[in-house]
Amino acid sequence: MAKTRVQDYVEKFSDQPIRFTPYALKKTGLVQSQVFLKIEDYMLICAPFQLSMKRGIFLVVLSAQEITFFQQFQKKLCSINLTFQKTGTKKPLNLFLRGTIERIGPVKGKQNVCMMDASLKGCPNDLVEILGDYITAFEGLKSQYGNFSGKAIPVDDAAAKLMRFNNYVELILGTTKARATLTALAVNSLSLRLSGTPPGLAEGEPCSAKLYFQVYQFTASGRVSALQRGEGDQVLVTMAIEFTPELIEIVDDFFFRQSIQGKAKSAAGK
């Protein structure tokens, strides 16, 4: 008998957590403001941190005294309410989970933030599909990252329009932000042009770039891999960037749209 998609996901991904970055929140449709953890008579508003089919880690704003108070509920039963709103669907999906609080403690370096670790007593099929679909798609992005690495796209007006780029990017060096022009991009690198040299700009230095597209606004982190003087006071910066799922989607979509355009032109020329 053929396995169902749910059975396949449970076998492959039951212990694999996803971390709720802005990208994961958008793709899964989890409504961040509608995550609640109930312990006995206490209902806590949580920020999701990690979730698998067996375990969830949630962040709660609590004082030191409140954290000490709630630690008495370790190994006690709890319930979790999650709400998902997928793109294109009008009705939200509300899920109710039961579990056990395994650990409660302060988050190091974060004042008044508590981490609550809960083991789940079961995972609804809807949640299995949401997590499984996301993990499967994310693994596909990792494969595309390898395929597209080094394939730089010169960002002229036509390319910017095709990739739906809003022509706005900021280079971030520590606390310094500098407006830049994006001249080329790949899944593993960005080429930027700046007017002037902002403080801290040097080869090998960690940096990030915030990019604005119609589909996503996101930050790509990495290091300055090369610097070159341009005309006047202009500086040309090459960034080696880390795996950034939003950018991989944009590059993949660009090459797809480009191929469609090419086929349309070929057909028109016949």
Report the location of each language-model feature.
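Structured alpha-helical
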Residues: 1-270
